Amino acid sequence: SHLAPASALACDAVVIGAGPAGLMAAQALAQAGVAAHVFDAMPSVGRKFLLAGKGGLNLTHAEPPEPFVSRYGARQTQLAPLLEQFGAPQVRSWAQDLGVETFIGTSGRVFPADMKAAPLLRAWLQRLRSQGVQFHMRHRFTGWDGAGALQFQAPSGDITVQARAVVLALGGGSWARLGSDGAWLAWLAQRGVTTAPLQPS
């Protein structure tokens, strides 16, 4: 969807970033009855997700919960309750609910049965749209104005968005050509938000 130049939009919730984290945030908002608007600088959704699919799309790992959570090192205590709620079994159920069967490879990794990302992404987007999620592509987030409104550059001109809640799902600093350039670190620093330096995963 495109908005008129210098236009303003008011939303309940904005998700900035249309990768897997942003889509999952939009899904959670929609399931809670919140109207979600997803903004992304790219022309289409899930660019890195589709790139990952070229290697078969490793969704998760099927090992038991204890060794699985131990792989998160110092963060395992923090992440254990989250992985109990949405760990490997739930990821597989989520994919199956979207009509995508999965299998466990010889390494224990979990893949879509057809080893492709596109069918899963298409089904996910169809589900999100049916739940009322709206997508605003080619909208590059440029920061906040003096009143705290979000600012975007769009093909039709600059727009300002007021939102009651904002989820930043902007990715790391890799694959700048796919939208993950780490520019958001400077924007957060300007607003006094402390961040940790980006590190390879």
PLM features per residue range, with description:
Residues 14, 30-54:
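Glycine-rich FAD pyrophosphate-binding loop
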Residues 13, 34-37, 102, 166, ...:
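Hydrophobic anchor at the start of a short beta-strand
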Residues 18-21, 25-30:
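Small-residue (primarily alanine) positions within well-ordered alpha-helices
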Residues 56-104:
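Glycine-rich active-site loop/strand segments that organize a redox cofactor
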Residues 32-34, 98, 131, 191:
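Conserved dinucleotide-binding and phosphotransfer motif residues
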Residues 5-21, 37:
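Beta1/beta-strand and adjacent pyrophosphate-binding region of the FAD-binding site
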Residues 79-89, 106-126, 175-183:
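Short beta-strand to alpha-helix junction loop
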Residues 51, 118-119, 123-201:
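Predominantly flavin-linked oxidoreductase catalytic cores and closely associated redox partners
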